[in-house]
A protein has these predicted regions:
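Accessory RNA-recognition modules of RNA-modification enzymes
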Residues: 1-178
């Protein structure tokens, strides 16, 4: 919700801005729920902020999760902005931080972006999945629109695609295939 805690899930009905965490959603695969839970817990623990669409501040924008039904292969892509300086919170966010100091915890993440992403990757790989984790990606997106635009992707683990089989055909699926 507006200026609320970090949330990861779906847009609240009738709201373009509010996100509701859907940790127990039964219409998605169990592996999706586990990835969402691990990601949310990790970034909350690190005090990393979500991207605020109107202020253009914050770091986390989108989490893409793809899983092949037939092969069970899983691809995860974290989409972030590059507008946050590391270590910790700096740059454009300082004015916002100073005005909301009571809401900022003292133990904000003080490492580099690489260290932050390595920690997230390790947390994801430590979890147990029914499927097979084939790739963990980090995509940068500074587009002001609320769309996932690829302005550069790094492979943190594995590969940047997975395979799915359908009617005897094999398809190579990337984060931006659909």
């Amino acid at each position: 919700f507006k200026d609320g805690p970090l949330a990861l899930g779906m847009h609240k009905r009738g709201s373009f801005y509010d996100i509701v965490t859907v940790e127990n959603c039964q219409i998605v695969d169990e592996d999706f729920r586990k990835i969402l839970s691990v990601t949310l817990a990790y970034f909350r623990e690190q005090n990393i902020t979500y991207y605020h669409k109107l202020r253009h501040t914050g770091y986390l924008r989108h989490l893409l999760v793809r899983k092949a039904v037939k092969t069970g292969e899983i691809l995860v892509d974290l989409v972030t902005t590059t507008q946050t300086d590391f270590p910790g919170i700096a740059g454009a966010q300082m004015d916002e931080v100073e005005s909301t100091l009571n809401n900022v915890q003292e133990n904000a993440f003080a490492g580099t972006e690489e260290e932050l992403l390595e920690g997230w990757k390790a947390a994801l790989l430590a979890a147990d999945y029914k499927g097979i984790m084939t790739g963990i990606l980090h995509t940068r997106n500074d587009n002001v629109a609320d769309t996932v635009t690829n302005e550069g992707t790094d492979v943190l683990y594995g590969q940047d695609f997975f395979y799915e089989e359908l009617l005897g055909l094999r398809f190579k699926i990337t984060p931006f295939s659909f």
